[in-house]
A protein has these predicted regions:
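Amphipathic, Lys/Arg-enriched alpha-helical "gate/interface" segment within cytosolic domains
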Residues: 1-125
């Protein structure tokens, strides 16, 4: 599975790991699962170090509409993404730019940096 996630309700934390090609449909599935679990407001760590994004500009716009629907009714917790490839950096910027949420979001080179920042943002981890 290209995307897998674990939700820790006690810690109010979602850990997402991606590997290989990831499509917009797989991202939608992950967002839906997190929303259904009432975890949208939790701190999120997305390790995209091994992700190969596979979506078009139209896909990104479609995801923007979906994120608008989520954030209209659900809180958004801080997001830390781990990744170093140019592809992941570009994709992160595109999603942050289209997201209607004003949540804090940053990209990091290491998981340790991401976790430290999330802890400073949410007090959890």
């Amino acid at each position: 599975m290209p995307l897998r996630w674990q939700i820790d309700h006690a810690a109010r934390f979602v850990h997402i790991v991606g590997e290989g090609p990831v499509t917009i449909e797989q991202l939608e599935e992950h967002f839906d699962a997190i929303a259904v679990a009432n975890a949208m407001g939790y701190a999120k760590l997305f390790d995209a170090s091994l992700v190969q994004p596979r979506y078009t500009d139209d896909d990104v716009m479609r995801m923007g509409a979906r994120l608008s629907a989520y954030t209209a009714n659900l809180p958004s917790g801080p997001l830390a993404v781990v990744g170093q490839s140019e592809e992941v950096l570009i994709t992160f910027r595109r999603f942050v730019n289209i997201s209607p949420s004003d949540r804090p979001a940053r990209i990091f080179r290491t998981e340790a940096e991401a976790r430290a920042w999330l802890k400073s943002q949410s007090g959890h981890l």
